[in-house]
Swiss-Prot record:
It catalyses: tRNA(Glu) + L-glutamate + ATP = L-glutamyl-tRNA(Glu) + AMP + diphosphate. SUPFAM superfamilies: An anticodon-binding domain of class I aminoacyl-tRNA synthetases (SSF48163), Nucleotidylyl transferase (SSF52374). This is Glutamate--tRNA ligase. It comes from the Bacteria. Belongs to the class-I aminoacyl-tRNA synthetase family. Glutamate--tRNA ligase type 1 subfamily. PANTHER family: GLUTAMATE--TRNA LIGASE, GLUTAMATE--TRNA LIGASE, MITOCHONDRIAL-RELATED.
Length: 546
């Protein structure tokens, strides 16, 4: 077989060589020893999920911790799965979580010297490599129709053998030049298949940076490299792009493990160095006591939009995911409470290979700790930015009352033990909306030992003695006086010792006042809140209940 002639028959329009792309267009990167090149390569299907972000943080840390390069590549070769606007969604979502790419696709165009970074724009490159494989005798045209392939599959099932296109079932594997020419003259569509030399009885070994040494069955399938429209399959594009973009580490989910033999054979056939493969564990959750994989259908928290709509701070999500990614992160954080997360020495050796457990409750706890360290001014700006996107009806209120909102967010946060009760924007607004008359409502009930008439007596006394200029001590002393004058213990411990002597204690009186002013039985420091509200609003809140 004259493979050179076959290649020219199939690819008359391809005039460049693989070495042209390797040496001229995409030469080896000039990086320091040990620098890693990673890529995130999502498909524009309209859904970007937590698993993408999980893997992206691994990519980002490997690259930036080694002074390497982090690439965003869009794998858009499957027209059937493309969703309008999905690329913009992917990029904006990743930007929201502060993932910084060094090169690749962007909303305003591409950055970098190893593009195009959209696979749909790299057709000539893939066809050049495919032509090279044909010249090597390791790829060939297949003219089988869908019906013929289905018939082959039915026969394989009937004979109880492996399904697929291989060995004796690869009916176009050894077509002559004359036969190929005849098919072409008949304008029959064709795909380009890889000619595998694998034996299904054989295995090979390969190292995975997370899972260690793996023993796997070799690939024996003659997989499709180029579809009939000249666009590559995922398997082929992945190998070509990772080689020419000089990717050193491929981070992907464990669901791709089964494809590793294909990629291994393609890399070795082309004489290219394999990247280091890092197959991450599935994100799992406990559901009714059973551990299962997070599901797009069952679990809204799998989609990144879930966190963006609620307004989780990207720093909180990243902090939490790092606790899942590396088993020693929490210990490091305890020892380095104020250090930047990028100072943490991330390691592939500390990653789980048996299913990473995702827990929303723990994310919320982590978020409380992270937000407690972020200045109120920054939280306000984040809240406003979130509102402009997801809760436009409160934007004007936040802007008109900027100083007051910042002060509200500051209450109880500037002490040795700052309050930790802010989680995400939706919850933060719920937490402070009592300040706005438009949203104020009485949510909680008075203590069981205080009826409506009793509450009015307390509130009336409070209104009569309230002086906005009182300091915190003077203010609370007046509340204690109101308590004792109305039969309540001035100290909870006094009530605890002699419950029959009192109606309740000063805490009950404070709760009545708190509910009147903020609508809830618990809140941050009430004296500070009143100082922010101003005397007029405080008196109005009390008066409306009398």
């Amino acid at each position: 077989m004259d493979y050179k002639k076959l290649a020219d028959m199939l690819f008359p329009h391809i005039t460049k060589s693989v070495s042209y792309y390797e040496d001229v267009v995409f030469p080896a990167r000039n990086l320091s020893p040990g620098a890693k090149v990673t890529r995130l390569a999502p498909s524009p299907t309209g859904f970007i999920h937590l698993g993408n972000l999980y893997g992206a943080f691994v990519d980002e840390r490997l690259a930036h911790q080694s002074n390497g390069v982090f690439i965003l590549r869009i794998e858009d070769t499957d027209d059937k799965r493309k969703v309008e606007g999905a690329v913009e969604t992917i990029i904006s979502s990743l930007e929201f979580f502060n993932l910084k790419f060094d090169e690749g696709a962007g909303i305003n165009g591409e950055t970098g010297n190893y593009g195009p970074y959209f696979q749909s724009n790299r057709a000539e490159i893939y066809q050049t490599v495919a032509k090279h494989l044909v010249e090597m005798g390791r790829a060939y045209p297949c003219f089988c129709s869908e019906e013929e392939l289905e018939e082959i599959r039915k026969q394989q099932l009937a004979e109880n053998v492996n399904t697929g296109y291989y060995g004796k079932w690869a009916v176009h594997r050894n077509l002559t030049l004359e036969e190929v020419q005849k098919h072409l003259e008949n304008n029959e569509s064709f795909v380009i298949r890889f000619k595998s030399m694998g034996n299904p009885e054989e295995t090979f070994e390969i190292d995975d940076a997370i899972r260690g040494r793996l023993s796997m069955q070799v690939n024996f399938q003659d997989i499709v490299l180029l579809k009939a429209n000249g666009i590559p399959t995922y398997h082929f594009a992945h190998v070509v792009d990772d080689h020419l973009m000089r990717v050193t580490h491929v981070v992907r989910g464990e669901e791709w493990l089964s494809t590793l033999p294909i990629h291994y054979e393609l890399f070795t056939t082309l004489g290219w160095d394999l990247p280091v493969y890092c197959h991450t564990a599935h994100l799992m959750k406990i559901d009714n006591g059973v551990k299962r994989k997070l599901s797009k259908r069952k679990d809204p928290e799998l989609g990144l939009e879930y966190y963006m709509q609620l307004g989780y701070h990207p720093a909180a999500v990243r902090e939490y995911l790092m606790t899942i990614l590396n088993s020693n992160f929490e210990e490091w954080r305890i020892q380095n409470p104020d250090s930047d997360i990028n100072d943490f020495p991330f390691s592939l050796n500390k990653m789980s290979n048996s299913g990473a457990l995702f827990d929303l409750d723990k994310l919320n706890d982590v978020s409380k700790n992270v937000l407690a360290k972020i200045p109120a001014e920054e939280i306000y700006e984040f809240l406003l930015k979130w509102a402009k996107e997801y809760k436009k009806e409160i934007v004007n209120l936040l802007e008109e009352h900027k100083d007051s909102v910042i002060k509200l967010l500051s209450v109880g946060r500037n002490s040795e033990k700052p309050r930790k009760d802010l989680i995400y924007c939706e919850q933060i607004f719920e937490f402070i909306k009592y300040f706005f008359d438009e949203y104020f409502a009485i949510v909680d009930k008075y203590p069981d030992n205080v009826d409506e008439e009793e509450a009015k007596k307390i509130l009336k006394a409070y209104l009569e003695t309230y002086d906005h200029n009182d300091d915190q001590t003077q203010w609370f002393e007046k509340i204690k006086v109101i308590a004792t004058e109305n039969g309540y213990a001035a100290k909870p411990k006094d009530y605890k010792k002699n419950p029959d002597m009192y109606k309740g204690h000063v805490g009950d009186v404070s709760t009545v006042i708190r509910i009147a002013i903020v609508g809830r039985s618990s809140s941050p420091d009430l004296w500070e809140i009143q100082q922010i509200m101003g005397e007029e609003k405080v008196r109005e809140r009390i008066q409306r209940l009398l």
